[in-house]
Structures are given as structure tokens and as C-alpha cells.
Regions:
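N-terminal "arm"/small-domain region of PLP-dependent enzymes with the aminotransferase-like
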Residues: 1-60, 68
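Conserved PLP-enzyme active-site core in the AAT-like
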Residues: 2, 13-17, 78-195
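Generic structural signal for well-ordered, non-membrane alpha-helical segments
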Residues: 5, 23, 59-63, 110, ...
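Generic alpha-helical propensity signal that fires on short helical segments
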Residues: 30, 43-48, 52-54, 73, ...
């Protein structure tokens, strides 16, 4: 997001370039798939040699605009959009963890996140240990060689407890583990965990 724009202006006005129809707001692309110039164009697109839309379930102009807008508001380098918060959490953790790893999570997390940690991760030999938000200073004692991620929500769901992100970030950096934050309530207007 351009520093010349206030946050609110950027949130509303950052959008994809206008088409030849000069629409005021972005057009909705309600298509399942996109066309290609020829077989070679299609092959190169599927091989990700070209940045072209293939299927809307992967990307389309609206999805790209949404991701670009959130990335700008969050102060991130890049991002992905998911259909739900749990899809984002599962995809993120699934991409970063492997059998034998440990997640160190705040005890206060969304019920479905807790179910992921207690019902599904054990099937894949991924362990989850918990720390209390009120006693976050003791988190370092829980970090082990197999700890790959510190996970937390802030504000928590449903308790709305607030974590010190800079504190957690410093611990994660010190121990070479990733910090994953679910920012479900605060939105980038109030809190930017990435920045």
C-alpha cells in the first residue's frame, strides 16, 4: 500500500487496474475457468511459466486483488487467500510441519484449532504442547529441539486475551522457530503481526 494513502483510503481504493470498460469498482469474475491462446499457452500456464489465471479455485482477478490488498494492509511480502480461517491454519501448518515436529501453542485457541492439534496432528506424529498466556514468560522452558512453530491467537477466541507479539517474536527468533499468529479479530487496521 502506498505510504501516500491513509490506511482507510488504501483499503478501499487499492484495486486491480480498470478494464477497457472504465468501471468504477472492480468487476466480479464469476467464471470457473479461463481460456488460452493455444495449446502452448495452456501448457506454459499450467507449468507456472506464465502468470495467468487457470481456474478460479486457484486464482482469478478478484482473488488476486483481495490478496494484494490484504498483503498491503498487513505489511507482508506476499500471501494467499483461503475460504476460511481454519483452511488457512491447516494449510499453513500442514506446509510447515512434518512427522516428529512439535507445535508450541497458546492454550487459549479456537475450538477447531484445538481439535486439529489434539485429534489430527497425533495421527501424523506431530505433538502439540501448550503455554498459558498469563505465564508467557515461561514459554522458553517448553521449547525443545523438535519445536518448529509457536502458534497463538491474539486477541484469543473466545476470551479476547492479548499477547505481546514482540515478546513472542523475540523468543521465536532466538530459538530459530517460526511464529504463526491467527489475527482473526483485530484485522490489519488494529494489529499487524507480520509487520
Amino acid at each position: 500500500m502506498s505510504s501516500k494513502k491513509e490506511f482507510e483510503t488504501g483499503a478501499i481504493r487499492n484495486q486491480m487496474p480498470r478494464s477497457g470498460y472504465s468501471e468504477h469498482t472492480s468487476a466480479m469474475y464469476l467464471t470457473s475457468s479461463f481460456v488460452f491462446d493455444d495449446a502452448e499457452d495452456m501448457r506454459a500456464s499450467f507449468a507456472e511459466e506464465k502468470e495467468k489465471n487457470i481456474y478460479s479455485r486457484f486464482s482469478n482477478p478478484n482473488n488476486t486483488e483481495f490478496v494484494d490488498k490484504v498483503v498491503a494492509m498487513e505489511g507482508a511480502e506476499s500471501g494467499y487467500a483461503f475460504a476460511s480461517g481454519m483452511a488457512a491454519i491447516f494449510s499453513t501448518l500442514g506446509a510447515l510441519l512434518e512427522s516428529g515436529d512439535q507445535v508450541l501453542s497458546a492454550r487459549s485457541v479456537f475450538g477447531s484449532t484445538h481439535a486439529l492439534f489434539t485429534k489430527f496432528f497425533p495421527k501424523w506424529n506431530i505433538e502439540t504442547s501448550y503455554f498459558d498466556i498469563a505465564e508467557a514468560a515461561g514459554i522458553e522452558a517448553l521449547i525443545r529441539p523438535e519445536t518448529k512453530i509457536i502458534f497463538a491467537e491474539t486477541p484469543t477466541n473466545p476470551g479476547l486475551e492479548i499477547l505481546d507479539l514482540e515478546f513472542l517474536g523475540a523468543i521465536a527468533k532466538k530459538h530459530g522457530v517460526l511464529l504463526v499468529i491467527d489475527n482473526c479479530f483485530a484485522t490489519p487496521y488494529l494489529q499487524q503481526p507480520i509487520a
